[in-house]
C-alpha cells in the first residue's frame, strides 16, 4: 500500500511497516494524545493555559527502543511497499 493508506491504517489503530524493515521487528504505530493524556491524568483544565498532548507517530526500532515523533523521509512518503503488521 502507499503512504497515504499507511497513515489511514495508523489512524485506525493498526501498526504499519515498510517491507524492507521485515525481520528487524520495526513498525510504526499511533500514540493517541487524548488517551495518553488520560492515562497520565493530565490535561483536565486544572491549571490556566494547561497544554494538551497531541497524537504522534512512534516507531519501534530494530534496537528494541521506541522513538516518539517519527518523521517520514521522501523515500518513505513515495514508497508503495507499506504493509499492515498483524
For the regions a language model picked out, list residue spans one by one.
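Extended non-catalytic interaction/regulatory regions in multidomain proteins
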Residues: 1-62
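Short, compact, well-ordered microdomains
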Residues: 55-86
